[in-house]
């Protein structure tokens, strides 16, 4: 009888232990050539295109006029005088631009007329544009190696932190498993000891005492493991945040030097083929962004409308949607097919710091995965600058 009772208690303990176990995210020549009115016709494979009207005279249809205005604004803000002259005085460069922008002949002709006028204005406004461009190039060639070295060091340290977090987390996980095992063993021995007490006249207390000791050891192991994990995470957060701040400060050095004259830095692009097609693809992005906006049902009805003149020479008014900037809408378009050289530095540097907001957010995370993402993001920014440094260096050696 006692044997059967002992067997039932043992089965009960094993069943309870099993129950606990089971519950457990990227032309320096030619101001004069522009003055000579270089031929503006460009064959884009669209011979049936009809004239749009004269943009400067305000006789163009409203939608095409708005596109020309957006394109002129883009060239004013994002393209250097040197590169604009190159585009307008080299027919091959212009044809490459038009092809990349996917412009029909009528729009290409009107855009070129508007750009001829813009080039004259830019030359008259800034006679020292060549000297400024050279100044920016010299600064970048001198300072970038230092910035690169410091950024690479920060990236290595971030990855080391991520590896450290993984190791500590793995260690504390093992400790927690050991703690759990000890706790289970403690529970079994304690239950067995208590269950056998009525049948062994106190002899089962021999099992009860080690069970309680194992329980205390399990509790201490769990507390120590959790404390180690929390301490490591807190320390890692502080270190990662410091590294990200230092890295962003390095990126800011580039932006602060360029200041309001960021467009002149575009002259660092040494590859005419890539330059002209890159600008063309950005203009294509402007057209697509506008087309997408117009294709949204009731989009125009959901925004207030304002009336503006098409041009300074014309009193004609057109109704225009008070909409988000097309430049802002197209900023997220990546020129991935221009890789591996990211010549369009202005798109990658002007907003380099501001687009890095999530680097701060990543630095607040204690996980190894997030730290690795932060390191990867910094490395991508560094690669953009490094590609441009190589272009400048090769151009200087010619």
Swiss-Prot record:
Residues listed as glycosylation sites in the UniProt record: 261
Compartment(s): Secreted
GO cellular component term of the entry, any: very-low-density lipoprotein particle
Residues modified to Phosphoserine: 311, 314
Keyword Glycosyltransferase: no
Bridged cysteine pairs (disulfide): none
GO molecular function: chloride channel activity; lipid binding
Biased composition annotated in UniProt, kind: Polar residues: 35-47
Effect noted on mutating residue 188 to T: In a breast cancer sample; somatic mutation
Expression sites by tissue: Plasma. Found on APOA-I-containing high density lipoprotein (HDL3). Expressed in pancreas, lung, prostate, liver, placenta and spleen.
InterPro entries noted in UniProt: ApoL
Region Disordered: start-end pairs: 35-55, 297-317
Post-translational changes noted in the entry: Phosphorylated by FAM20C in the extracellular medium.
Family the UniProt entry places it in: Belongs to the apolipoprotein L family.
Involvement in disorder: Focal segmental glomerulosclerosis 4: A renal pathology defined by the presence of segmental sclerosis in glomeruli and resulting in proteinuria, reduced glomerular filtration rate and progressive decline in renal function. Renal insufficiency often progresses to end-stage renal disease, a highly morbid state requiring either dialysis therapy or kidney transplantation.
Protein name: Apolipoprotein L1
Organism: Homo sapiens
Lineage: Eukaryota, Metazoa, Chordata, Craniata, Vertebrata
């Amino acid at each position: 009888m006692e044997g059967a009772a002992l067997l039932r208690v043992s089965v009960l303990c094993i069943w309870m232990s099993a129950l606990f176990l089971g519950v457990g995210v990227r032309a320096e020549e030619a101001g004069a050539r522009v003055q000579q009115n270089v031929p503006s016709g460009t064959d884009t494979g669209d011979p049936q295109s009809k004239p749009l009207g004269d943009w400067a005279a305000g006789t163009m249809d409203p939608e095409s006029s708005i596109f020309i205005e957006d394109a002129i604004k883009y060239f004013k803000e994002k393209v250097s005088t040197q590169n604009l002259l190159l585009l307008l005085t080299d027919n091959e460069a212009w044809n490459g631009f038009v092809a990349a922008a996917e412009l029909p002949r009528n729009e290409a002709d009107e855009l070129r007329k508007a750009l001829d006028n813009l080039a004259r204005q830019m030359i008259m406004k800034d006679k020292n544009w060549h000297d400024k461009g050279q100044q920016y190039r010299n600064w970048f060639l001198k300072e970038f190696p230092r910035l690169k070295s410091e950024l690479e060091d920060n990236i290595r340290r971030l990855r080391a932190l991520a590896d450290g977090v993984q190791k500590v987390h793995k260690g504390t996980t093992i400790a927690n498993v050991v703690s759990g095992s000890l706790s289970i063993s403690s529970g079994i021995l304690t239950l067995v000891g208590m269950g056998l007490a009525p049948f062994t006249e106190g002899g089962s207390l021999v099992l009860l005492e080690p069970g309680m000791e194992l329980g205390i050891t399990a509790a201490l192991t769990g507390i120590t493991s959790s404390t180690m994990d929390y301490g490591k995470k807190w320390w890692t957060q502080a270190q990662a945040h410091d590294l990200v701040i230092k890295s962003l400060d390095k990126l800011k050095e580039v932006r602060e030097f360029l200041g309001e004259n960021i467009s002149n830095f575009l002259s660092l692009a040494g590859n005419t083929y890539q330059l002209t097609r890159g600008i063309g693809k950005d203009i294509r992005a402007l057209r697509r962004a506008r087309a997408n906006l117009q294709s949204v049902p009731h989009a125009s009805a959901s925004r207030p409308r304002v009336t503006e003149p098409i041009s300074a020479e014309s009193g004609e008014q057109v109704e225009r949607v008070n909409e988000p900037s097309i430049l802002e809408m197209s900023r997220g378009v990546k020129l991935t097919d221009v890789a591996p050289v990211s010549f369009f530095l202005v798109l990658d540097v002007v907003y380099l710091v501001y687009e890095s907001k999530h680097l701060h957010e990543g630095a607040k995370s204690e996980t190894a995965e997030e730290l690795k993402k932060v390191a990867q993001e910094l490395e991508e920014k560094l690669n953009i600058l490094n590609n441009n440094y190589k272009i400048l260096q090769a151009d200087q050696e010619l």
